[in-house]
Structures are given as C-alpha cells and as structure tokens.
Amino acid sequence: MQRKSNFRDVFYVSDGTAITSETLGHAVLGQFPIEIHQTTHPFIETNERAKQVKTLVNQSHEKTGIKPLVFYSIVIPDVKVIIEQSNAHFYDVLNVLVEPLKHDLQLEPEPQLQRSHSINKDAASYQDRIAAIEYTLAHDDGISLNNLDQADVILLGVSRCGKTPTSLYLAMQFGIRAVNYPFIAEDMASLKLPAAIEPYRFKTYGLTIDIERLVAIRNERYANSDYASLEQCEKELHKVEGMFRREAIPYLNTSSLSVEEIATRLLDISGLKRKMC
C-alpha cells in the first residue's frame, strides 16, 4: 500500500554510534513539512549486518512504494558499498564535508584517526560528564546551596519554567555544573536573591515563561490547584521578572524554546565554553 507522498521512512546508519548522522538528519528534516518514521542502526561494521540493513531499507520501499531516506556515516568501504546498493535516497553526512576538506588541506583522510582521537579523550570526558551530572543532581531544585564556588551556572526562576531539564542537559551534553533554584509562593512577599547565591550573582541567569504556558504545565500535574491558577502564575512571574530587572540578572523566556535551544542560548549569553563535544 502506497502512503501519502509527504511521509518518509528514514534510516540513520553508521559503522560508529550513528550520533552524527542522526543529529544532522534531524536538523535537515526539521526544515520540511513531512511525517517521518525513523530507525537508527549503529555499529554496522560487517558485511552481514550491512546486508540486514539493506534488506530493511528495500522492504520499506516495497511496502510503501516510496524510496526511504538514508542518512549515513560510514568509513568501512565494503559496508558502504552494500548500503548504497539499497533502493533509497542517500545522504553521506561525512563525505559532504570530507571531500572539500581533502581538497583544501591537500591531505588524504585517515578514518582510523577519528577513532584514536576519540579513545584518547573518552576517559577524561566521561569523568567530567559524571562529575557534572552528580553536582547538578545534588543542586537541583534548591536541594543544596553548598559549594556554589564549583558551579559554572546558577539558574533561577519560578517552579516549572524549565530549570531542571535545562540544567541536566547542560551537564550531560557539555559537562557544565549547573545549580537551579526555584522561587516559590512563600518567597513572593519579600522576594530577593538568596544570601548564599549573592556572592555568585555573576553566575546567575533567570528563566521565565509566558503565563498561559506556565498555567498549562502546572495543571498537568496539579489540576485546579491554587499553584496552577492563572492568578498565582501571573503573580509569581510578575514578581520574579521584576527582581531579575532590579538585580540586573539576565533572563530568557523559555515558552517557545526546546531544552536544546535554551541551553545553547544560555551558553551564548553567559560565554560559558562547552567542556566536551
């Protein structure tokens, strides 16, 4: 049965982790108004596994009557040849950059070099990542305000404005130690920067959100409560944003942003450097 023309099966294939092909594929496909069904096939390092993927791709074409899209990052020649024999549209996410670099550098690429570079830095990167995650979890949602000298960034805002997922994303993706502190209803009478955070105000950044969006998020967990009421959300946001302006704390509206976008914008305005790739 042939599906509608704006539907595509998408395959991400790699003889490595497939993270590169997935990331670039997502970024490109996000610009088109199509519906996709995607599968990821990492570590396709043998002819046998390549033939299995080839069969799946061909089955997709036979079932839908539409050529699937294959984003691939493969350096093993035999594996690459087999995958390219599939009945699909192909997008070689490595070669599109390797070929121009080969010309500009006047050097031949050495695929195994990538693997050795990765191995050499993996141990240190892993330890940095784990340390950042542990620190961030220990300082989530105002649990602790100890050891703030070790923090890379301190996020402030009302409850449910995106602080926790942003903090964890910064830690997991970039090895950044993030503290997040919520201002709650009881803080509103005399709202100010906590004394423990005051010496580190240069690390502080605020997150805010549209009133309607905050009401919707809070109602998902605490429907029809005072906490989720329009009046309470409006009051908290008004007071917290006022404090941000009064204390000259930069802040960002998260309403229409993904966690990835929030984190990237924070890195940009804070000048923080990514600690890992």
From Swiss-Prot:
Pfam families according to UniProt: Kinase-PPPase (PF03618)
Signal peptide: none
EC numbers, comma separated: 2.7.11.33, 2.7.4.28
Molecular-function GO terms, alphabetical: ADP binding; ATP binding; phosphotransferase activity, phosphate group as acceptor; protein serine/threonine kinase activity
Family: Belongs to the pyruvate, phosphate/water dikinase regulatory protein family. PSRP subfamily.
Function text: Bifunctional serine/threonine kinase and phosphorylase involved in the regulation of the phosphoenolpyruvate synthase (PEPS) by catalyzing its phosphorylation/dephosphorylation.
PANTHER family according to UniProt: PYRUVATE, PHOSPHATE DIKINASE REGULATORY PROTEIN 1, CHLOROPLASTIC (PTHR31756:SF3)
Protein name in the entry: Putative phosphoenolpyruvate synthase regulatory protein
Organism: Photobacterium profundum (strain SS9)
Phylogenetic placement of the source organism: Bacteria, Pseudomonadati, Pseudomonadota, Gammaproteobacteria, Vibrionales
